[in-house]
Every structure is written in C-alpha cells, then in structure tokens.
Regions:
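The conserved Walker
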Residues: 46
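Conserved lysine of the Walker
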Residues: 50
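Hydrophobic positions on the alpha1 helix immediately C-terminal to the Walker A/P-loop
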Residues: 53, 57
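A glycine- and Lys/Arg-enriched "phosphate-lid" helix/loop adjacent to the NTP-binding pocket
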Residues: 136-249
Length: 257
C-alpha cells in the first residue's frame, strides 16, 4: 500500500462493530454495483482523523465493491516505503525549499495518483483525503498571504489546479453534498455515520460527497503530539489557527449552500 497502514486489529474491530446491512439491497442488484460513480472526500483541519477514517472507509468498501481507490494526501503518501511528503514539509518549514516548490510538489502527488489510479474512469468509488482544491485555497493561500509566494507564483499554482481538476474530472467542494462528522469520541460512531450516509448516497445516485471532520482544540493538538511528526510539531501554532478557521468557514458555506 502507498499510504500509511493502520493496525489490522483496529480495522477488524471497527468492521466487526459497524452495521453494514444497508448495503445488502445495493449489492443484490448487479445494475447498481456496475454503474456506481461516486467520490467520497474525507476533509478537515490537521489532526482531525482524516487518514484513519479514509483508510477504514476504504477497507470496508473494497471488500464490497469491485473498483474502489483511495487517494491519500501528500503527507500520508509513501514512495518505496519512504514518507516523502513528511520530508518535503520539513524542508519547507526549515526554508530549504521555497513554499512555491513545496506547493507544486503537493500537486505533483495529486496528479501522479489521479493519473495512475484512473480517477476519471467511470464505475469507480474514489476515496480522497481532502481535495486538490484545499491544497491551494487553504495551504497555498497561507503562504501567499504571508509573502512566501509571489503574485505570479500564486497565479501559476491556481492555473495548474484548474487544469488538474478539468483533466481528471475532480469535483470541487461547492459541487459536493456535505455532511459534518463529529470525531471527538468513539471512532466506530464516526465511521458508522459515514457508512450510513454512503449507503443513502449510492441508493439516491449522489455523485460527490464531502465529509467534514471536527474535533475540539484539545483533541486535535493531542493527536498532533501523539503521532509525533516533527514537521507538524515544529509548525507555529498560529498556522493551525488559520487552518481551523479555514475549515470552519468552509463547513459553514457548504452547510448553507
């Protein structure tokens, strides 16, 4: 796998305790399973549990449907078992590469996956950690606003994002149905809520769904420290405040569109 593995014991425990009976009606109709084109986006700020929930959702769905793909975010993506995303983020934080170079690297990871996993193919369930759009509108914008990226660099990155979305038919947030998921408490409860919505979406022909994860401030900081990524721990705290505000605003917009 080219994403961060989660313990098989956790996968088995969650699957054992999640009610998936709602899939039976879908699976008994071959016409339903052969014509599913559905994009699932697991999004949110840093430390809200995106990777874990995206991977658990993948583990559940891949055993039920024929063509399920997962698209980890750059920080979870591995090349030859090396977390290149984490290395690149360290270089950016320590100013050994420019913010613009780093943001193009993030889009490189997206484009590599979208191309080689056949994102634009029909009859596929795609699970994405965030959208490419978020990389630019939240994270690149922070670098642009504080002067790390020039006006020309900002324009070039935005143009590249538009081209990627168009070429691979990637949805944007405003095109997606939205559901906010509280991931403060038992993980199995959050996964169950997501599975219930996925079942309804497939039955009703929904094509794009964003699940926005939320946790309280103490919980997300505890997760950042516990998983021990130096690149995250060394980041300035006001950066996380910006990320949290961005996703809070995004959730409000998507909830009331």
């Amino acid at each position: 796998m080219n994403f961060r593995d989660i313990p098989s014991e956790l996968v088995n425990e969650i699957i054992k305790n999640v009610d998936m009976s709602g899939f039976m009606e879908i699976l008994t109709n071959k016409n339903n399973t052969s014509n599913i084109n559905y994009n699932i986006v697991i999004t949110g700020s840093v430390g809200v549990g995106k990777s874990t929930i995206a991977q658990l959702t993948y583990e559940i769905l891949k055993d039920l449907f024929d063509n399920v793909q997962i698209y980890p975010e750059y920080i979870s993506y591995k090349l030859n078992d090396v977390s290149v995303g984490n290395l690149m983020l360290d270089l950016k934080i320590n100013k050994l590469i420019t913010a613009e170079t780093f943001q193009h690297f993030v889009l490189d990871i997206w484009e590599h996956q979208l191309q080689h996993k056949g994102f634009s193919n029909e009859n596929c369930i795609n699970i994405l950690e965030r959208l490419p759009e978020d990389a630019v509108t939240c994270f690149t914008k922070e670098s642009y606003m504080n002067g790390e990226i020039s006006e020309l660099g900002w324009d070039n990155i935005n143009e590249r994002l538009k081209n990627i979305n168009k070429k691979y038919k990637v949805p944007i947030n405003s095109e997606c149905k939205f559901a906010m998921i509280d991931n403060n408490n038992k993980l199995v409860n959050a996964v169950q809520e997501i599975i219930n919505i996925i079942i309804d979406d497939i039955k009703n022909g929904v094509k794009n769904r964003v699940f926005g994860l939320i946790v309280d401030d103490n919980e997300y900081m505890k997760r950042i420290i516990t998983r021990g990524r130096d690149s995250e721990i060394n980041n300035k705290m006001d950066i996380y405040k910006h990320y949290n505000e961005f996703y809070s605003d995004l959730y409000n917009k998507l909830s009331f569109k």
